[in-house]
Amino acid sequence: MFSATSSKWEVLPQNQHTIVKYDSVVYDTAKMYDTKTFTAKVPKDGVYHIDARTGIAQTGFFSGYTEYISIFKNGTMIKESNRSRGTDNDRHLPRPSLSVDLLLKKNDEINIRAFCSDQRNYGGESTLSEFSMRLVGII
């Protein structure tokens, strides 16, 4: 189906769910991923496996703050990764991730959003951030 990665660090505004810019397509056999909106459009009804990970806070963040990523379907959050706290250590690079199976309908729109309660950055190179989807079953 598809896999896309990020290629650079982007600003992550404080306390805002921000669509992750997975801007480099590794493959897209179903032509379902849009690199302008960073959204996948489901090509047919079925169960899809989604994997997502994103580097957050290139230089770490303070212990009083948290970060996570979420899957949004048609503009609504449907899954959230574990939340992690900062460590006050600039060597700490959080990489929240999600791996789920979802029942989706044709034309559902899926994107990944990053969140940090402190203003930081997200993304990084392809070794840190990736979003992929594949059809695993037709219902």
Which ranges hold each PLM region?
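Extracellular jelly-roll beta-sandwich "head" domains, especially the C-terminal globular C1q domain
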Residues: 1-139
